[in-house]
Design a protein with these regions (language model features):
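Structural signature of extracellular appendage/secretion-system components
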Residues: 1-477
């Protein structure tokens, strides 16, 4: 039959098991505000029994292991949703900055119709839409009073303001474009740093788990945090090896395999000044569909490029159409053949420098020496209402309104996508918190349970100690 020392060992093992429980609960409570931490649980099991003549004698309890409470599927969903959020948050920010630089406030519901500029986008007082209207109004004012130098001076000033706005917008859009290129470059560097961290954690996890036979819970938490940070930069795929390490692939190219970095991301210029991303070792151009890197590239090459193309086309057509009519006109001195606008696009459009110094050189008449002739000025004013095939059969104002509308729709879509992501992300976070989060009430209850069990085990030891003293006293008498 079992002796007192067997009972003493049983109680000692019980105290050790309860102490492990207290330690784990303490670890959970210490990390209650750590968003990367997943709750841990001590798993207890009956220790191996001892066969006796009279039957089987239990030996108490022991720690089977410390389990990390995680839902792998939920973790993957959160990681993937992070890529969605990274993409659309970057797009939203870039499009919002573009709206600011354009000088128009967009609500995303504007729609150009009948070639007019009447849309539900709200133009600022000095926006391009207003200045286009001011230009053609100034042509009309010259036509109404063709001998007035002051009206001609107003026309030149309005044209200079319009050209200056085109120039400023082009410069600002270049700045947005450069910022997106910088974002791509910086995010690629950040992604490579995270890949290096993940490879290092893979090594630590594999070594720790091989040496201890236990799951490296805290290291796995940190690796998951790194993966989620990486997913915000780019979409990725993972697979788990038998030693607990991960293989991380981006765009179909393995970047990390166990403790080794097999490839890295590289931002490169394909020759057009617009950074793209490839695998540095494999040399493969990567098609990224999620994360902030893809969001920056997609916005830059999509909505921003379309906006710039639309503005350049508008400026080019304005220059060409106005100059075509204007160059056939005559100024107050009988001169003809000069152009009104200079340049070829939004960045280079300007006004004939001679006109600023001498508004009498404005060519408003249809024939030389015809005092009061407004033929050309009137024809120029009428350009405002003429549909242009190169502008999608829209007027100048209508084409600009459509360009603004397209940007507004892109921004509205990005806003919707970010709102949807926030809702999904919040729901997933709540689900994970219910699984892996630390509950203070639960841990305090566990602490009390472990404490009482520990005290009970200590009482067993005290009782056995008294019994041993009795036995010893009997043998000494």
């Amino acid at each position: 039959m079992p002796g007192l020392f067997d009972t003493l060992n049983l109680a000692t093992r019980s105290m050790q098991a309860q102490q492990a429980g207290v330690t784990v609960s303490g670890q959970n409570l210490a990390n209650i505000n750590n968003p990367a931490y997943s709750r841990q649980r001590v798993n207890l099991q009956t220790s191996d029994p001892v066969p006796l003549v009279g039957g089987i004698q239990g030996t108490g309890v022991e720690v089977a292991g410390i389990q990390q409470i995680r839902d792998g599927l939920l973790d993957n969903q959160i990681r993937d949703e992070g890529s969605v959020g990274g993409f659309w948050t970057t797009a939203q920010s870039a499009l919002g900055n573009t709206q600011t630089e354009l000088g128009e406030f967009l609500n995303g519901t504007a729609a150009a119709s009948n070639g007019s500029a009447n849309t539900s986008s709200t133009a600022s007082a000095q926006g391009l839409s207003t200045q286009l209207n001011n230009l053609f109004s100034a042509f009309e004012s010259v036509a109404s009073d063709p001998t007035s130098l002051s009206q001609r001076q107003v026309l030149v000033s309005q044209a200079q303001s319009l050209a200056g706005s085109f120039n400023q917008i082009a410069t600002r859009l270049d700045g947005v474009n450069q910022n997106l290129n910088s974002s791509v470059s910086n995010d690629v560097d950040s992604a490579n740093k995270l890949l290096s961290d993940i490879a290092s954690l893979n090594s630590d996890i594999a070594k720790t788990e091989a040496a201890t036979g236990s799951t490296a819970n805290d290291l796995r938490d940190l690796r998951q945090q790194k993966l989620e940070s990486l997913a915000q930069l780019t979409n990725l795929q993972t697979s788990t090896a038998s030693d607990g390490s991960l293989t991380v692939s981006i765009g179909g190219v393995a970047m990390v395999s166990g403790s080794k970095i097999t490839d890295t991301l590289q931002a490169y210029d394909p020759g057009n000044g617009q950074l793209q991303v490839r695998a540095a070792v494999a040399g493969t151009a990567l098609t990224l569909t999620g994360g902030s890197i893809a969001g920056a590239i997609d916005t830059r090459d999509g909505a921003l490029a379309n906006l710039r193309t639309g503005l350049d086309n508008l400026a080019s057509q304005l220059i060409g159409k106005v100059n075509s009519v204007y160059s056939a006109g005559y100024d107050l001195n009988g001169n003809t053949g000069a152009d009104f606008f200079t340049g070829t696009n939004a960045a280079t459009i300007g006004v004939n420098a001679n006109l600023a110094n001498d508004p009498s050189q404005v060519q408003a008449a249809g024939a030389a020496g015809s005092v009061g002739d407004n033929t050309v000025a009137l024809a120029l004013a009428q350009l405002a209402q003429q549909a242009n095939g190169a502008l999608g059969n829209q007027t100048f104002s209508g084409a600009y309104a459509q360009t603004v509308t397209d940007l507004g729709n892109s921004l509205a879509n990005a806003n919707d996508q970010v709102a949807n992501h926030d809702a999904v992300s919040s729901m997933l976070a709540q689900q994970r918190d219910s699984v892996s989060g630390v509950s203070m009430e639960e841990e305090l209850t566990n602490l009390m349970t472990y404490q009482k069990a520990y005290q009970a085990s200590a009482q067993i030891i005290s009782t056995v100690n008294l019994m041993l003293q009795t036995v010893i006293a009997m043998k000494t008498t």
